[in-house]
């Protein structure tokens, strides 16, 4: 995802690390619908000392901790907060989503994704809405 958005918008380059940090909580929530990935994320949360009474609670704690780090590091929570213009986002998102699905790194994702779903995920990242699919 970060590869395909870095230089896609006129409002400025999104550096690779910043994009990864911004996208990570959303991607974890998307991938956590895969049972194997969910177990792994919950284990990461446990091993880093986070608390939760269930796998889902541990994953939420992990995402919350990443969000807290991002605030400390002054990393925007959304693409909108980064300064991407909504009209430009809407104009380009279908192509960006299609290109992101075709990126070599996407093939190693624990949960398969198609262009329409990638577009939904990017839309969550733009507006800061919950990943519930």
Language-model features, listed with the residues they occupy:
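Short, hydrophobic/aliphatic alpha-helical segments
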Residues: 1-9, 95-101
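Amphipathic alpha-helical segments in well-ordered regions
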Residues: 4, 26-27, 125
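Gly/Pro-rich interdomain helix-loop hinge
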Residues: 8-91, 131-132
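Short, amphipathic C-terminal "tail helix"
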Residues: 88-133
